[in-house]
Amino acid sequence: MENSIRSLREEIAGFRISSADELEAFRLRYTVRKGLIAGLFSQLKSVDPARRPEIGNMLNQLKAEAEARVEEAALSLEKTTSPAAPTIDLSLPGRRHFTGSEHPVQKVLGEMKQIFSDMGFTVATGPELELGSYNFDMLNFPPDHPARDMQDTFFVKRDGTEDDILLRTHTSPVQVRVMLDRKPPIRVICPGKVYRNEAISARSYCVFHQLEGLYIDKGVTFADLKATIYSFARQMFGSDVQLRFRPSFFPFTEPSAEVDVTCYLCGGKGCRVCKKSGWLEIMGCGMVHPNVMKNAGIDPEVWSGYAFGMGVDRTVLLKYKIDDIRLLFENDLRMLRQFPA
């Protein structure tokens, strides 16, 4: 029995394992339940009982050596057959780093500011969280005006008094603050975010950017207003842009008008964006209402002025032929990278 164990140990030590097939052959020959080592274990019952423990220990040691040989060979084969670590090709270009740029809304707003700055306007700003008196009362809004309803306005505190606190629905309150703080002549633009409780769609959003303008001086007429808007539109949209003024109504201006430009998609022929009219509205405007001037302590018998307001986001849609305003708020890099610095 001892000679059989010694002979099998030498055979195991000399067995060459260099492939998965050879490893499997080794396992089947020596370590499985019907292998040679298991066969020797089955012969223990014929060994002298006095020597049986000694022979049993020798077989256990042989079995452990064979199993260790299997594990060692398996690890060695795994290392040699695993894919090689990828090498770095130093001649290849590195990963591209994209240069940051202005958001299209900020880009267009900057252009608008520059155009009006060249006309002599200065920039004025104010709080986005506004008092109801500045947002409505001083701008000649009647108490029952629909804009005061919660369906149109985000109220932070509402008790039906001048102390209502809300997210401003336009940047006109900045004009009120300017008229209260400065003496005429006044020539300012008021850019900023505004908030309205509107359904989100391709053409409207609950938060957007607005730019309003105010000019007060002696002898200001509607002709001055039209000249300013014509000059702005041609610099912003191109010298061939067509404009039209439509009579309208705003509580804070009289007379009032809405300004349209030819549709950027169809060129005035009619499409779904312009609702087959060929025109797109870009702003509202008019002569400052005498009541607004009186509320700010300015004598309308001496001074006159005009005001206008437009959505910056809508101007972005017009300028870059974007058909969905929601794209401006989704932070989709595929869209934003189309507007390089």
Curated annotation (Swiss-Prot):
It holds the Pfam family tRNA-synt_2d. It comes from the Bacteria. Gene3D superfamilies: Bira Bifunctional Protein, Domain 2 (3.30.930.10). Keywords: Aminoacyl-tRNA synthetase, ATP-binding, Cytoplasm, Ligase, Magnesium, Metal-binding, Nucleotide-binding, Protein biosynthesis. Its main location: cytoplasm. It is found in: Cytoplasm. It catalyses: tRNA(Phe) + L-phenylalanine + ATP = L-phenylalanyl-tRNA(Phe) + AMP + diphosphate + H(+). GO terms for molecular function: ATP binding; magnesium ion binding; phenylalanine-tRNA ligase activity; tRNA binding. Its EC number is 6.1.1.20. Mg(2+) binds at E254. One of its GO terms (cellular component) is cytoplasm. The keyword Flavoprotein does not apply. Its cofactor is Mg(2+). GO terms for biological process: phenylalanyl-tRNA aminoacylation. Binds 2 magnesium ions per tetramer. InterPro entries: aa-tRNA-synth_II, aa-tRNA-synth_II/BPL/LPL, Phe-tRNA-synth_IIc_asu, Phe-tRNA_ligase_II_N, Phe_tRNA_ligase_alpha1_bac, Phenylalanyl-tRNA_Synthase, tRNA-bd_arm. Belongs to the class-II aminoacyl-tRNA synthetase family. Phe-tRNA synthetase alpha subunit type 1 subfamily. NCBIfam families: pheS. Tetramer of two alpha and two beta subunits. This is Phenylalanine--tRNA ligase alpha subunit. It comes from Chlorobium luteolum (strain DSM 273 / BCRC 81028 / 2530) (Pelodictyon luteolum). The lineage of its organism: Bacteria, Pseudomonadati, Chlorobiota, Chlorobiia, Chlorobiales.
